[in-house]
Amino acid sequence: MRGARGAWDFLCVLLLLLRVQTGSSQPSVSPEEASPPFIDPAKSELIVSVGDEIRLFCNDPGFVKWTFEVLDQMNENKQKEWIMQKAEATNTGKYTCTNKHGLSSSIYVFVRDPDKLFLVDRSLYGKEDNDTLVRCPLTDPEVTNYSLKGCQGKPIPKDLRFVPDPKAGITIKNVKRAYHRLCLHCSADRKGQSKLSEKFILKVRPAFKAVPVVSVSKASYLLREGEEFTVTCTIKDVSSSVYSSWKKENSPTKLQEKYNSWHQGDFNYERQATLTISSVRVNDSGVFMCYASNTFGSANVTTTLEVVDKGFINIFPMINTTVFVNDGENVDLIVEYEAFPRPEHQQWIYMNRTFTDKWEDYPKSENESNIRYVSELHLTRLKDTEGGTYTFLVSNSDVSSSIAFTVYVNTKPEILTYDRLMNGMLQCVAAGFPEPTIDWYFCPGTEQRCSAPVLPVDVQIQNTSGPPFGKLVVQSSIDSSAFKHNGTVECKAYNDVGKTSAYFNFAFKEQIQPHTLFTPLLIGFVVVAGMMCIIVMILTYKYLQKPMYEVQWKVVEEINGNNYVYIDPTQLPYDHKWEFPRNRLSFGKTLGAGAFGKVVEATAYGLIKSDTAMTVAVKMLKPSAHLTEREALMSELKVLSYLGNHMNIVNLLGACTIGGPTLVITEYCCYGDLLNFLRRKRDSFICSKQEDHAEAALYKNLLHSKESSCSDSTNEYMDMKPGVSYVVPTKAEKRRSARVGSYIERDVTPAIMEDDELALDLEDLLSFSYQVAKGMAFLASKNCIHRDLAARNILLTHGRITKICDFGLARDIKNDSNYVVKGNARLPVKWMAPESIFNCVYTFESDVWSYGIFLWELFSLGSSPYPGMPVDSKFYKMIKEGFRMLSPEHAPAEMYDIMKTCWDADPLKRPTFKQIVQLIEKQISESTNHIYSNLTNCSPSQQKPVVDHSVRINSVGSTASSSQPLLVRDDV
């Protein structure tokens, strides 16, 4: 080894001597003719093993410089020969020889190291949408499968593309933001074994793809001189390299600002730039702009500063300051005013008396920078003595201001005196405002309607001696000697408000002979005609006051502004596929009866299959029904056929419209209405929703064996079936066995009796509320408004499945205390939303209010809402003022929260039925939810997904059942 090295040294010296000897005789080489140096060994790559010698010689006649590059490191050597006696893996890299002309040659050296296959620079940064290099060059080029792998065996993203280079590393193409914090290894196979480098954590610098988001703490500021002005601008972007600054428009002055910044996550950067002027002056007023920019673009936002030398108050009357109002009417005096600083004292004054109530003052806007306020004085049922000057005063720390309203009360004339004077004059004195006019009339006899005018001989006008702005007194006289016959003189005083009359009856000595025949006949005719008119009017009034039968359910066709447009049910098509032969119906007992019709239990033969019979409910009209009632029942049939089937509504099964009175065939619900069911179950209610109380429930049911079941006669809507022996199943087993949605008749008597003997628990109540919400959500998806949702209108069938119905035809609302007479309608006031009571507005949101009342009924086990409170003016007033019922005894806190949201005074803040379903789903047990889902999947018709009505409705109004509001001004 030493001999070879010595020979090599000798050869190098010899070559140098030859160059020195020949160099002086050769001409100099120009840069244009220069050539790059020659490296020995003459290879582009050199592979050595760790510990071997690296000897590189740069052959060039002039000065040379060696540079060694690996990763981001560079070493230099100004010798022509680069010698590394014991090579290490870190000596792997590119060796470049450069001559004095700047020309260079290079060789890449690999130093194989069995323990170090990769040279690693663990810092790994990449810019979004650009390429980045994973610096893991190889020390041995003779490996395979040089690639990237995820840490801990995780796969790399499918869209990650890379290009390997043994000398530089692996280039990741088109870096994405999703690669941020991606853990990677460089991987290669050597001699059949996979080798991994140290791990890299890729940090991605996001690219700007949008302008910064800029906002300010307030859009405008109003300050007095000397106060501090502070405004904060918030800049949001993906990176801290975003630029921002405060500028004042039309001012080159540099503004002093402070910064505070932080990162919220990897690509959410937020900066706050706060501008402060410690003591403002009037000339500081102007527009300040917060400007931010990145490589994508710029954005800005402005705030306005107004500086005043002192505070101010400006008052703006919203009505004329001179007000005329009729006696007994109401008037509101309204002002708007601007006040800065905030007002400290406000008051209304009348005749040196300060009002302590009847007025309200509030800011016009909830905006923090609002300086505009509203003050209203409410004067109710003004008397004639309450005219005068009403003054509004307001003040703040700097200034005070006021405005006066002059109120005149218009009063109907009042005749103060009417006398016969000693000189034969008749005098009439009247008072009123505006000034009354007095006219005189004469008629012969004792008539009370005189028509012949008489001119007065003396008229005097004087102001009243009462309080200011009071009545004006007018005096008028006539000479009675001008009248030659017995008669009546009328003094009529009138103005714009009304009129009043007084009469003078007098007789002269001569008597006028009355007609002996004509007058009695005329009087008799008038009396008879008057009585007949009165009788006709009474009969007409009673007929018009009689509640008319109509379909409660309304289907919305479209919404125009603030009005619903309903589909006229009479115009809906009727599909004769629903026709069922009358002779296949066998009628039984009456389930319910009302003023217009009744519901009868019946057996239908061959309704589904020719060899089956099933129990159904049939709606029909009474023989005394009018044409309007017949049309209403047909409309109800068309609405039911339009809605289609759903598990939680009483579904249409068929109809008979040909060859006789209209019959509507619907599902039969064995337990009757939910209200009576809850009341029957009060004594056996278990305050738990865990089904592991089944044995306790059965034991309790044995103690209450006399409790009514589906065969009891106490409920008007029950199936009469003979009792059978059976074993009582658990409630969950009973529900699983129910085949809801199938119309095929089967013997359900044992199941019905079993279900009714089961106790009632909290899980049942939650299930009922959940099912009714599902049914109402279905109706809302069909644009249908119920308008009478209550426990009495919910039926219960086997499996404790609830079904929503409309009892309008078969309920005796005349004798039902839940329905209050208003106009020509009887309405369930305690279940109605405020907008329905006061404005006749029926919407999806008013149904949500009624649902909240239904929940209160449900969790009070059938109690009447607002217990002990009659429907009177006090009730209406409490509803207006936001009175709501307390939580019923058995309601969980979550359910009472739902009730309160249903009773929100703002209809838009009430939840939709779809949202209510989602809220209750969180309360019911998994088994109940699973059972209900299974029952829904067994439904014979595929139910369409429920559409949230809040997507379509803006809580607009409609005139519906009654043509007049339920509450007028005199009611409260």
UniProtKB/Swiss-Prot annotation:
Mg(2+) binds at Y564, N793, D806. GO terms for cellular component: plasma membrane; receptor complex. The active site is at D788 (proton acceptor). Gene3D superfamilies: Immunoglobulins (2.60.40.10), Phosphorylase Kinase, domain 1 (3.30.200.20), Transferase(Phosphotransferase) domain 1 (1.10.510.10). Residues 564-566 are annotated as: Important for interaction with phosphotyrosine-binding proteins. ATP binds at residues 592-599, 619, 667-673, 792. One of its GO terms (biological process) is digestive tract development. Present in an inactive conformation in the absence of bound ligand. KITLG/SCF binding leads to dimerization and activation by autophosphorylation on tyrosine residues. Activity is down-regulated by PRKCA-mediated phosphorylation on serine residues. Residues 585-933 form the Protein kinase domain. It comes from the Eukaryota. The modification Phosphoserine is found at S737, S742, S817, S887, S955. Glycans are attached at N130, N145, N283, N300, N320, N352, N367, N463, N486. The chain crosses the membrane at residues 521-541. Residues 1-25 form the signal peptide. Keywords: ATP-binding, Cell membrane, Disulfide bond, Glycoprotein, Immunoglobulin domain, Kinase, Magnesium, Membrane, Metal-binding, Nucleotide-binding, Phosphoprotein, Proto-oncogene, Receptor, Repeat, Signal, Transferase, Transmembrane, Transmembrane helix, Tyrosine-protein kinase, Ubl conjugation. Coiled coil: none annotated. The modification Phosphotyrosine is found at Y543, Y549, Y564, Y566, Y699, Y717, Y726, Y819, Y896, Y932. The keyword Transmembrane applies. Disulfide bonds join C58-C97, C136-C186, C151-C183, C233-C290, C428-C491. Its EC number is 2.7.10.1. The record marks Y932 as: Important for interaction with phosphotyrosine-binding proteins. Pfam families: ig, Ig_PDGFR_d4, PK_Tyr_Ser-Thr. The keyword Protein biosynthesis does not apply. It catalyses: L-tyrosyl-[protein] + ATP = O-phospho-L-tyrosyl-[protein] + ADP + H(+). Belongs to the protein kinase superfamily. Tyr protein kinase family. CSF-1/PDGF receptor subfamily. This is Mast/stem cell growth factor receptor Kit. The lineage of its organism: Eukaryota, Metazoa, Chordata, Craniata, Vertebrata.
